[in-house]
A protein has these predicted regions:
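Feature recognizes metal-dependent phosphohydrolase scaffolds
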Residues: 1-332
Length: 332
């Protein structure tokens, strides 16, 4: 290792333990716009790939309980899109991730915001430090094609190289696709498939996910679909997935014995929106999205009764690193 590197240091070996002290050092180092040593980045990503490979495509999550049986809470966040300083603010407001204060991040950690590397790396570090403290689901931006166009690949190659980018792609291919909290709330990045015969918890849990999402089918619908206000379905304006009506949400929840659908994937002015007769929530956690939307961010906290409570927040100041700084010239 170059003697000039004075940043946070991990132990030696293939899988050195990641401590909370190391994470706090890294968070502070990133806030100063400094670059974590490549050796550690590779060690961390290799650990992450092995960890995510070992979990199901559908996570079954429980609210934490203390030794007396008292039930705690769960925090669900939406898109963060490389807005690292706003992610740090989420942890200032909601508390750091821990088994007693668990978080679920619902995809789209990267792209558009130009501090995407630091954003996703911080989430991965919390995940590896204690798997019960933080959970990550795949979004449509945790994919090779999107990363090529919307900035993450350009950012990683600017800060590191293609080898590191290839490792991120391998990690993203192993991320789970959906979660059920307390047998009650279904969380997914995009939305529902309108192929109702395929849209079951059993089918989701058996998806062979270690790949780029195909152009159509259940996996891509989960990542890309959006709710619409009127019943029925339409091909999505995005070109992938569908728009699904309240009838699809009601049918899916009833068929699978669930109460609520939580999804992200769309910026909302207040940081969240409740629709489909209260059965579908969109949560979005990147305030003043791309430095221009003026929206609030929000997260959801679920307590024992599993009723959603919302916390809204505004964007915090950040260094002058413009969004889309590393995006593909194909966009211009």
């Amino acid at each position: 290792m170059d003697a000039s590197y004075t940043g946070p240091k991990l132990g030696d070996g293939v899988s050195p333990p990641i401590t909370m002290g190391f994470i706090m050092e890294v968070m502070d180092y990133f806030k100063q716009q400094k670059i974590l040593h490549r050796k550690y980045v590779i060690q961390i990503l290799l650990q992450a790939k092995e960890y995510f490979k070992s979990v199901s495509s559908l996570l079954n999550l429980r609210l934490p309980e203390d030794t007396s049986g008292k039930v705690g809470h769960f925090i669900v966040c939406g898109d963060t899109h490389g807005q690292f300083y706003d992610l740090c603010n989420i942890f200032n407001i909601g508390g750091l991730p821990s088994p007693d204060n668990p978080y679920l991040f619902n995809g789209d950690f990267v792209d558009r915001g130009s501090v995407s590397f630091e954003t996703v790396m911080l989430l991965i570090l919390f995940k590896l430090q204690n798997p019960l403290a933080l959970y990550m689901l795949r979004g449509n931006h945790e994919t090779k094609n999107m990363n090529k166009i919307y900035g993450f690949e350009g950012e990683v190659k600017h800060k590191y190289d293609q080898t590191v980018m290839n490792l991120f792609t391998a990690v993203f291919n192993e991320l789970p696709l959906a979660a059920v909290i307390q047998d009650s709330v279904f969380v997914v990045h995009g939305g529902l498939s309108t192929d109702t015969s395929a849209m079951t918890l059993e089918a989701i849990s058996s998806i062979q996910r270690s790949r780029e999402p195909p152009e159509s089918g259940l996996m891509s619908d989960l990542l890309w679909s959006d709710p619409q206000q009127f019943p029925g379905r339409l091909p999505s304006k995005r070109g992938v997935g569908y728009s699904f009506g309240p009838d699809y949400t009601k049918n899916f929840l009833e068929k699978n014995n669930l109460k609520l659908l939580v999804r992200s994937h769309e910026v909302k002015q207040e940081g969240y929106v409740v629709e489909h007769d209260g059965k579908c929530i969109t949560i979005f956690s990147a305030p003043n999205y791309c430095d221009q939307m003026g929206n609030k961010g929000a997260f959801i906290k679920f307590y024992e009764n599993m009723e959603p409570t919302f916390t809204q927040f505004d964007a915090v100041p950040h260094p002058n690193v413009p969004p889309m700084q590393y995006a593909s010239s194909m966009l211009y």
